[in-house]
């Protein structure tokens, strides 16, 4: 803590990919001292030592700590003189707490916004370009929120590219503007850093130095804008340009040329992240002890029912121990009652345990409750889903096996009495085993399928144990690549491929003509399966499948409505894996039973959660598209670390019209069109409608394959962002891959932190959380 006789000082530290920055801020908001220093990994050093010393500097993290200690010492200060320290930056690691005492961590985006607003309080647009990524930040007055966009994994629009150019031309970045020929028309590649560097090598001995520098700086500016400039579309005003790349005034010149906006470079542009962290440290110090983390969804049970406690007593076999357990149960039952509505909370269970005299009985109770608390909040339906998935995907039977994609109506296959295998879901199940996944990717690569191919489809091409299909059905939309891969798989596994494969033509736009086209196609697909498999469709069974689908639909809508109108009841981390709209159980009794159990569990959860949480007390996020299946880290970080629960998931929207058992093909065609994924306009409208109904405060789109997936491409994202902005809902786009973790950009957690901090600022008036009442 700072000395009481002195004015308070606040420290902000920004640990980036190539530099470390620090700022000391006074109580009055004046910069007392700043530091901008290149970081160089220590030769042969470990990431972090295991000793007690925290500032010896003999490991990489320790070296960073020693840099801060030396920085403070240069102005005659130590950490004891600092009232509050906040850190930010892409290279902040978990071990940092052992080496540097700090009070809070904030995202780089929030830090840069705070830094810019410290000197430009009315600024509306900020562009930060550092060594590893570019960040655009824009204030939306209608939503009263700072929106942001970060570049992906390419280095072309970052300081790393300019460092490469500087080294090749032997010109310091700070001198490039002086040597730049701004009238030059020479162009180099702005597609990627590697191609750009290749162009520099090709041109440096063939053109004047000023022309080459101009080409490199223009390419840099263009790549920055192609990566994050979408956020500034239709914006006309000043842009605060900060970060290390702002040392190069030539890049600023070309940014102004491209955007038509005035570019302002602050005095402290290289340390604006650290400055913002120091500004936030001053605010955090003033709120210390007054704020608490926002409420989020519980991931585990908070208590056990009295009947469950009775089960514990009944399980005790030793007569003496049983008498003691029964005595304790009677005392509890007198206070709580014996019905299933009363519960023992975890603290109450601890008190009960203290009343037990037998150590053995204490251990037995502890083991019993641990098992209960480790269960998910919707335990029975989760177990049913697991069992049904295992049966559907891994059981063997005499019935013909039909491969299907996510969109072909499962009711038809249920009525035909065949076994079905949804190939995309089968691939997703592989995601939990990275070793097995790697083997699939390796084998697919040997067949010529590179990373440009969807990872779901690469898994299928590379899986040498893919169950043999007797027939395959797919749809032409929304994934044409999937249709072609399915056809290739059939050719590779079936001698008479043409008679064992059917593509249902699915027009992107709805209307009666599209419905008729799909209905006729469904009839053709049934005829093709009848011929190939030697089976016959029973119209009564198809009508029954429609009736069962309607029953499950009605229950699913009730489940949705409960979640729409309640505080977050279950973690989105778990619920997104349900993917109800893609299930192959529609048309079966199992789906009805599953939805009935899930409904009962949700009603019980609702009663419990609403005792201590109001619907408006938490953030309410909508998760769009699929999650990363290889790890729950991303969604867990969002919901638990950042306290921003997912209230609902797009893949669980059930809202199509009832099926008509007397006209099954037409109604199934209508269902297929109204699910939404075939037509972006229908999809976006449904998202908007459900978002309003569910009181959604923010949306997260997981951008599978970085926009190359047809269900989350750049045009869809642009349309979605504009549409959600109209109704005041901010959108976070997380680039990544649902199965291939090697392409996961290191900026994912930063984006999540920045998004939730902006939501906190809008909801609570500060980024840290609600003020205690």
Pin down the residues of each PLM region.
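Conserved phosphate-binding/catalytic loops in two-lobed NTP-binding clefts
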Residues: 102-109, 256-275, 728-735
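Glycine-rich phosphate-binding loops at beta-strand->alpha-helix junctions
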Residues: 89-92, 232-258, 269-273
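A charged, amphipathic alpha-helical module
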Residues: 315-400, 519, 523, 527-656
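Glycine-rich phosphate-binding loop plus the immediately following alpha-helix
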Residues: 39-55, 145-182, 279-283
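Redox- and metal-dependent alpha/beta enzyme cores, enriched for Fe-S-associated oxidoreductases
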Residues: 394, 406-407, 412-439, 622-688, ...
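Short glycine-rich, Thr/Ser-proximal phosphate-binding strand/loop in the N-terminal lobe
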Residues: 10-62, 145-148, 152-153
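Adenine-nucleotide phosphate-binding core of ATP-dependent small-molecule kinases
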Residues: 196-230, 270, 683
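Glycine-rich phosphate-binding/hydrolytic loop that grips phosphoryl groups
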Residues: 114, 159-163, 267-301
């Amino acid at each position: 803590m700072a000395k009481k006789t002195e004015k308070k000082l606040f420290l902000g530290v920004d640990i980036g990919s190539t530099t470390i920055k620090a700022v000391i801020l006074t109580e009055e908001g004046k910069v007392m001292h700043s530091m901008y220093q290149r970081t160089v990994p220590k030769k042969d050093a470990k990431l972090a030592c295991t000793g007690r010393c925290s500032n010896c500097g003999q490991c990489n993290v320790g070296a960073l700590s020693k840099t801060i200690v030396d920085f403070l010492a240069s102005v005659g200060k130590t950490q004891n003189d600092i009232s509050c320290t906040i850190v930010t930056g892409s290279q902040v690691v978990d071990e940092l707490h052992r080496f540097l005492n700090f009070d809070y961590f904030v995202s780089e985006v929030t830090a840069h916004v705070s830094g810019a607003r410290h000197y430009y309080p009315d600024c509306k647009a900020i562009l930060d370009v550092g060594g590893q990524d570019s960040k655009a930040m824009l204030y939306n007055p209608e939503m009263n929120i700072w929106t942001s966009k970060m570049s992906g994994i390419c280095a072309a629009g970052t300081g790393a590219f300019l460092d490469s150019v500087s080294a090749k031309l032997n010109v310091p970045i700070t001198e490039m503007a002086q040597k730049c020929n701004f009238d030059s028309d020479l162009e180099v590649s702005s597609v990627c850093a590697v191609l750009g560097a290749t162009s520099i090598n090709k041109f440096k001995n063939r053109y004047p130095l000023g022309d080459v520098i101009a080409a490199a700086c223009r390419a840099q500016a263009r790549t920055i804008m192609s990566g994050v400039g979408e956020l500034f579309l239709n914006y006309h005003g000043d842009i605060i340009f900060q970060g290390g790349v702002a040392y190069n005034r030539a890049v600023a010149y070309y940014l102004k040329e491209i955007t038509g906006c005035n570019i302002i470079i602050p005095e402290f542009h290289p340390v604006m992240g650290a400055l913002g962290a120091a500004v936030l440290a001053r605010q955090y110090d003033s709120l210390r002890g007054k704020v608490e983390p926002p409420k989020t969804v519980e991931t585990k049970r908070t208590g056990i029912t009295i009947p469950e406690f009775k089960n514990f007593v009944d399980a005790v076999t030793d007569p003496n121990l049983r008498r003691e357990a029964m005595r304790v149960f009677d005392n509890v039952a007198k206070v709580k009652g014996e019905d299933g509505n009363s519960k023992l909370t975890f603290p109450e269970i601890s008190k009960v345990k203290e009343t037990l005299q037998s150590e053995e009985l204490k251990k037995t109770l502890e083991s019993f409750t641990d098992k209960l608390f480790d269960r998910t909040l919707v335990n029975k339906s989760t177990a049913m889903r697991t069992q049904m998935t295992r049966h559907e995907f891994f059981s063997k039977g005499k019935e013909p096996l039909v491969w299907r994609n996510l969109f072909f109506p499962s009711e038809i296959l249920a009525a035909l009495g065949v076994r079905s295998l949804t190939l995309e879901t089968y691939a997703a199940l592989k995601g939990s085993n990275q070793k097995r996944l790697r083997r699939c990717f390796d084998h697919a690569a040997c067949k010529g399928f590179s990373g440009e191919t969807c990872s779901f489809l690469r898994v299928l091409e590379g899986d040498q144990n893919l169950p043999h299909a007797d027939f395959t059905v797919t749809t032409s939309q929304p994934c044409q690549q999937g249709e072609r891969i399915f056809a290739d798989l059939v050719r590779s596994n079936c001698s008479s491929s043409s008679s064992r494969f059917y593509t249902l033509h699915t027009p992107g736009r709805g209307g009666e003509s599209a419905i008729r086209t799909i209905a006729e196609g469904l009839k053709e697909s049934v005829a093709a399966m009848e011929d190939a498999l030697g089976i016959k469709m029973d119209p009564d069974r198809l009508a029954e499948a429609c009736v069962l689908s309607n029953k499950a639909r009605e229950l699913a809508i009730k489940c949705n409505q409960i979640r729409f109108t309640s505080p977050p009841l279950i973690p989105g981390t778990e619920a997104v894996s349900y993917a109800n709209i893609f299930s192959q159980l529609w048309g079966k009794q199992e789906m009805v039973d599953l939805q009935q159990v899930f409904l009962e569990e949700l009603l019980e959860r609702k009663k419990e959660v609403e005792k201590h949480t109001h619907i408006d007390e938490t953030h309410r996020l909508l998760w769009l598209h699929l999650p990363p299946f290889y790890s729950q880290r991303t969604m867990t970080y969002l919901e638990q670390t950042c306290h921003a629960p997912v209230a609902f998931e797009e893949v669980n929207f059930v809202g199509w019209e009832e099926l008509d058992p007397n006209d099954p093909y037409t109604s199934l065609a209508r269902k297929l069109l109204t699910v939404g994924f075939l037509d972006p306009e229908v999809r976006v409208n449904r998202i908007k409608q459900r978002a309003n109904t569910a009181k959604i405060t923010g949306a997260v789109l997981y951008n599978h394959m970085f926009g190359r997936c047809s269900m989350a491409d750049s045009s869809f994202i642009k349309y979605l962002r504009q549409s959600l902005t109209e109704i005041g809902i901010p959108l976070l786009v997380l680039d990544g891959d649902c199965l291939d973790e090697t392409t996961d950009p290191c900026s994912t957690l930063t984006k999540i932190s920045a998004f939730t901090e902006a939501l906190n600022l809008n909801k609570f008036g500060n980024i840290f959380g609600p003020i205690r009442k």
